[in-house]
């Protein structure tokens, strides 16, 4: 009787488990601090996307990473005039002013640490992601 009960429990457990083959794709946000790779000194431009505004920061010497880590949105260290942006359905739209816009599909790699801009064809790397 005990063996029958264990066998029944085993069969019930075996057939009640479903394989979840269709896991949803991870969602990555553009919000945060992003560096342009290949600038001299390396990473001398940082974009900070937050609450629909893109702030631009520059670093010309010293420890740029430590400097960028200390910056916060609208802290006065950015260049004047943050730009408006939207990010919906994997499409980034940045209002570059004077009728100009950057509209590009974005794909993410490196667990969200690299944002690949389809047009104009470059990548941004999330600050402190180690993806460069």
Please tell me what each predicted stretch does.
Residues 1-16:
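Sec-dependent bacterial lipoprotein signal peptides
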Residues 14-34, 132:
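Bacterial Sec-dependent N-terminal signal peptides
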Residues 26-45, 83:
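Tryptophan-anchored aromatic micro-motifs
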Residues 39-41, 58-121:
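Contiguous, well-ordered beta-strand patches that form the walls/edges
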Residues 52-54:
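Structural signal for glycine-centered tight turns and loop->strand junctions in beta-sheet-rich domains
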Residues 121-132:
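Short, low-complexity, Pro/Ser/Thr/Gly-rich segments in the mature regions of secreted, periplasmic
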